[in-house]
């Protein structure tokens, strides 16, 4: 899978990425489903999601930012912020 260099973020592609990592149907990954509570994500799966996000979107996620990766919406907002940051 080629590394994405565009700053455009498609929520449905993000949903597919998360569903793929978690081996779930895309429909199960709703915007507000809590990854740990609703989708049974453990720490290893959370790390795998983080690694895939960094590779796919070409961003580095600081440890403090990982608390935002609790739902698709939170992840989307974090990535939108990171991709819009031109520093």
Swiss-Prot record:
The UniProt keyword set, sorted, is: Phosphopantetheine, Phosphoprotein
Q: Which GO terms describe its molecular function?
A: phosphopantetheine binding
What Gene3D superfamilies does the database record attribute to this sequence? ACP-like
UniProt PTM: 4'-phosphopantetheine is transferred from CoA to a specific serine of the apo-ACP-like protein.
Q: Which SUPFAM superfamilies match?
A: ACP-like (SSF47336)
The answer to whether the entry has keyword Phosphoprotein is yes
**O-(pantetheine 4'-phosphoryl)serine carried by residues:** 43
Name by which UniProt lists this protein: Polyketide-8 synthase acyl carrier protein 2
* Organism taxonomic ancestry: Bacteria, Bacillati, Actinomycetota, Actinomycetes, Kitasatosporales
């Amino acid at each position: 899978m080629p590394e994405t260099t565009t700053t455009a973020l498609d929520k449905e592609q993000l949903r597919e990425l998360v569903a793929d990592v978690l081996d779930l149907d895309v429909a199960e990954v709703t915007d507000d489903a809590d990854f740990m509570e609703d989708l049974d994500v453990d720490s290893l799966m959370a790390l795998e999601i983080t690694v895939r996000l960094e590779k796919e979107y070409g961003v580095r996620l600081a440890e403090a930012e990982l608390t935002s990766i609790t739902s698709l919406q939170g992840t989307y907002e974090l990535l939108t912020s990171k991709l819009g940051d031109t520093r």
